[in-house]
Each structure stands twice: as C-alpha cells, then as structure tokens.
C-alpha cells in the first residue's frame, strides 16, 4: 500500500512545472487527485498520464473566489472528501516598483496572495469539520531574499509565509495542518525567461518530494516550513 492511499488531494497550478510534479507524485503514492489550473489542455495532458478513475480535471482561476469554491465542492462530490490541498498556482513577473507597471503588481497580488487566501477559505471549513486535513502553500526563497527586479514578487511570497504562519496559530489543536514550502530557483518554463541557464536550479520533482515529506509525518507532527535550495 502506498503512503497516501485513498487520500483526496486538490492541486492548483497542476498543468505544468511544480504543480504537475506534485500532482503526479501524490497520485503515484495512492492519492485521488483533482487537477486545477487555468489551462484545460495542459491539465488534461497531465491527467492522461494518470489512472482515469482517480483523477479529475477542474479548470480553475484561483483569482476567482466562486471558481475556487466550486473546485472544492467538485473535489468532494467526485471523490467523497477532502484531505490535502496544495496551493501551487503562482505568478512571477520581473517588475520593479520604479517600472510603475501597476497592472503587473495587481496580477501577482491576485494570483499569489488572493489565490492563496481563496483556496484556504474554500478548503478549511471541511477540514475543520472533520478535524483533519493538510494545506500546503508553495512560497519561495524570494519571500526572504529580494533582488532589484523582484520587489513585488518577493512581497507577495513574503505574504504567503505570513499567511501560513498565521494559519498555523489559528489552526492549533484543530487537527488541521498547514505548511509553507519555499523553493530556491526551480527549472520551469516560468524561471527560464528570467534567469541565466548556468544558474543552479532545482527540479520540480525536488519540490514534490518536499511536499510528500510534509504530508507523511506522524499525526502529532506538523512541519510548518520547508526551505529547499539547490547545491
């Protein structure tokens, strides 16, 4: 028996990169997985690699609260519960404050901060009612380390850290766990546009393994934060 047999997991941003790697690994470990993201074709491509009776594609824009609410309802209607939610949807744009690209700021705030909050508020009522569940937010090293072109992105990921820390306190003694995972540079299509090819990068699978580690700790153990860096 695999370690997540019959657990029901929702993964946002599951159409590519880190989200795809997480969804695939959770499925390999026995979970029934709901794939969420904006691009239905990409989600379906991921789903086609998995057993069809244990995967569900739900196109979802995490900046739309109603769509996120519906996502959680569909997960429960399809598989009969909700055990794991991975907030992997994210947006990284190279946008300085002094570039004055307010539309880019709004977009990152909507995806990275509001998307995290909308997903939490949609999942937590069920988890609290059943006194179990695990919410994992994919943050970033950039939430701790700022470059001259990452101010807005770094601020949004710092917010994800703060949200996770606050939730840990709010959820204490409820049986519901919450974790943030902060990757360093990961080799994805998003990062390829902004970073030199010779810079050391993690593989998306490395982040998926960190997620699995957090999920498979004993019931009385909550891993609040994991930082993953390339060496």
From Swiss-Prot:
PANTHER family in alphabetical order: DEHYDROGENASE/REDUCTASE SDR FAMILY MEMBER 11, DEHYDROGENASE_REDUCTASE SDR FAMILY MEMBER 11
Keyword Hydrolase listed: no
Sites where the protein binds substrate: 140
Family indicated by similarity: Belongs to the short-chain dehydrogenases/reductases (SDR) family.
Species whose genome carries this gene: Staphylococcus aureus (strain N315)
Single GO term (MF): oxidoreductase activity
Name of protein: Uncharacterized oxidoreductase SA2266
EC number: 1.-.-.-
SUPFAM superfamilies, per the entry: NAD(P)-binding Rossmann-fold domains (SSF51735)
Alphabetical list of Pfam families matching this protein: adh_short
Stretches assigned to coiled coil: none
Highest classification ranks of the organism: Bacteria, Bacillati, Bacillota, Bacilli, Bacillales
Keyword terms: Oxidoreductase
Binding site for NADP(+): 10-34
Domain of life: Bacteria
Active-site annotation: 153
Keyword field contains Oxidoreductase: yes
Signal peptide per UniProt: none
Disulfide bonds: none
